[in-house]
Amino acid sequence: MRGADVMQEELFTIGGLDQYVPVDHPLRRVREVFNDCLARMDNHFEALYSAFGRESIPPEKLLRALMLQVLFGIRSERQLIEQLRYNMLYRWFVGVPLHEQPWDHSTVSKNRERLLEGGTPEVLFEQVLDG
């Protein structure tokens, strides 16, 4: 008997994005090193953000997304967000679970400007060299 060509969504997703990324994938090591650098930048990030108001995109996630943009030659933030919508490898690297929608590209632009004005690229570069 021929099976039907239908796609049934699961009610619950078991496991996380990590299970879809091969153990030997090169981005695993990149993410590990990058996360170590970002962890050492916590005081820098705290100084850039107010304790009040709406939560913004976590700077660590934004920087991981921008790292993907550079590594894979993604030409615009609009394309970056499009990739984050359906690319599980990118979602895993950035830390965006399947049940969350990626941010709007204009929000990414505004938050990127905050990081640039706050000297984040220089601090990140220092952390990479010190790593």
Predicted regions span which residues?
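Short, conserved catalytic/metal-binding motifs centered on acidic residues
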Residues: 25, 63-65, 80, 104-108
